[in-house]
Amino acid sequence: MTRSKFTSQGIKSKHAKKLKKQDYTVFSQKLGYTFKQPDLLQEALTHRSLGFPNNERLEFLGDSVLNCAVSTLLFKRFLLLPEGDLTRLRANFVNQDALHQLASALGIGELILLGDGERKSGGHQRPSILANAMEAIIGAIYLESGFEKVDQVIVALYDPLLNQLDPDLFGKDPKTLLQEYLQSRKVDLPEYSTLLTRGDAHAQVFHVECVIPEFAIRTSGEGTSRRRAEQEAARRAYKLAVVRH
């Protein structure tokens, strides 16, 4: 089997939509990795709204690879950090928000291949879709070049994020940060409510609101689970609270 002609499922891609050569070149430069098999990258960027094959299997693989690589990176970088803090810190770096941030920096939203309906509804900007594509790309690199190479790519991608870390905030998720900040100012804890749930049962997207009445702050978040949506809303509320108060 000639891999360059096949997807990770071993089936020739029949999708009419293709990546443009110029887009492929620019993306490779940003990513710091050039795919030897462009069809594999195309699969990683193909949303399930286009049918099969799509990037869901590569996303599954990339999720495991990313967790292993980030765990190793944090273990080596923060030698004195205890297991509990390392676990929470890793969660912050492999969650939807972090992956969406990486995907946006790479311009994945402009490259993602979507069905017409999904694109018209703004799918190319949806955090969950971009985060999933980021994981799929990581899975594709691993499949093509092995762990050592994908680990190098992941370290390069995460270095800027690690350099921005405030040591006092290690291992704390947005909801915890917001709660501690409000408690330090003797303000009532935020109120979370689900505004909307859309999508099929196996692929739901939650829209959650975070309200801090005393600060007149009202933010929203979106995620593939209620918890992820709450974390996103809390992250935005925390940023506003720190700036205003």
Curated annotation (Swiss-Prot):
Gene3D superfamilies: 3.30.160.20, Ribonuclease III domain (1.10.1520.10). Pfam families: dsrm, Ribonucleas_3_3. Belongs to the ribonuclease III family. Residues 173-243 form the DRBM domain. Its cofactor is Mg(2+). Keywords: Cytoplasm, Endonuclease, Hydrolase, Magnesium, Metal-binding, mRNA processing, Nuclease, RNA-binding, rRNA processing, rRNA-binding, tRNA processing. This is Ribonuclease 3. The keyword Transmembrane helix does not apply.
